[in-house]
């Protein structure tokens, strides 16, 4: 375990990923990347000058952090907090308030960068809101178990053994595959 302390800036996370890689770790779990986004929002709020222009000081730091996750030699699992809200659901003829997660506390569309995104509800059941592996797409909610982890690991290992594609050598310059 490599514990981070405040401030939770992107550079600290980037360094931590490097330390984990150097230590030979195969899997890194970052709990949570929402702390980094909160730091960047506070950083932005405290900058002087034009708020819109100040995003130019924030975005490269966020992008470097996400790229470091994506380019890691390790498997990286990230957690994110979600904004909470209550909804009323009918149960046995009564309206019961239930807490629901709405959106990840991170930059908009960050989920695009990940292979699988599980939304975990208050009962600790997961639903894949995004799944490039197609292992969990369209499935009803389920508990995250060791078996789920093994399915993901098997998928990762199958992808590792696929032959690499050498882009740009299959077709002469200027020609497009039909």
Model-derived features: where do they sit?
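Conserved inter-motif catalytic segment of the P-loop NTP-binding fold
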Residues: 1-67
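Interfaces that engage single-stranded nucleic acids at replication/repair/recombination sites
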Residues: 11-18, 134-152, 156-178
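Generic recognition of cysteine residues
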Residues: 20, 36, 74, 78, ...
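Generic low-polarity alpha-helical segments
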Residues: 26-29, 80, 178
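Short, surface-exposed, polar/charged, turn-prone segments marking secondary-structure boundaries
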Residues: 29-31, 55-58, 106-107, 145-148, ...
